[in-house]
């Protein structure tokens, strides 16, 4: 059975580490041989993924004691890598009601590991049991946790990003537009550090919570059946961008009818207007929820474009 230590780390069973090793091998193959050529000879040294509770003594506002009531990050460390590393928090989508934990969580984490980037897959609380500000608070706590423990995890505290897909993309854009520097006098040292991500990556994101482009399911699960229009507008990320919003990479498809491309475009234009470095790629075809797009010859190019952006942004060694 898993064991939770005093820091909220849940120790996993050995067979889970074996599955992770196999998954890593698949993704190292998919991204090509250039990464492998740069690595030292010998087998990769993989650390077993560990799940860390964001609040080991119980999350604020928790309504139960099941896993769904316990926001957490699962830590994926790249092999044969010494710090300080770039890190990214991964928020799977699922309309703020479920989490696509493999397609939009574990798979991207393994991909980032092939680039030498540490990845932290976020398990955040969901509707209809939980509503705003719980989800945003979980995301902010994840950023603070990684930053506060950066030295322990050999991470560069100023290179911590946030990637989200679909509703997770809305969470990523919300974390990018609603953050603070931390409370220097807080009792909890994690609360003393900034919740601002240093960069953001959005995959076919929900952005707007106002008509006509919102995804109604995500909006309802996040805000409830009859939300205050002012609150919905304040959480429509295209209305909240400032010059302090972090540099952002956006991936979208024109054929997406679940979250129309107008979501991504409106956010990109807001970033451009605010002078925030941003790059967006809209593919002609492709369904919503394609993850890394590895089953589609065209869509599978977007992780490569992301890699180029990360390198140009100084986020890869």
Q: Across the structure, where does each feature detected by a protein language model lie?
A:
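C-terminal catalytic histidine-bearing segment of alpha/beta-hydrolase fold enzymes
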Residues: 76, 251, 261, 265-317
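Bacterial N-terminal signal peptides
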Residues: 21-33
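N-terminal cap/lid segment of alpha/beta-hydrolase-fold proteins
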Residues: 39-83
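Short beta-strand/loop motif that positions the catalytic acidic residue
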Residues: 250-252, 256
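Primarily recognizes the serine-hydrolase "nucleophile elbow" in alpha/beta-hydrolase
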Residues: 141-218, 232-233, 237
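Short beta-strand element of the alpha/beta-hydrolase
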Residues: 84-93
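Catalytic nucleophile-loop/oxyanion-hole region of alpha/beta-hydrolase
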Residues: 100-102, 106-108, 122-157, 293-301
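Active-site glycine-rich loops that stabilize anionic/oxyanionic intermediates
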Residues: 92-97, 254
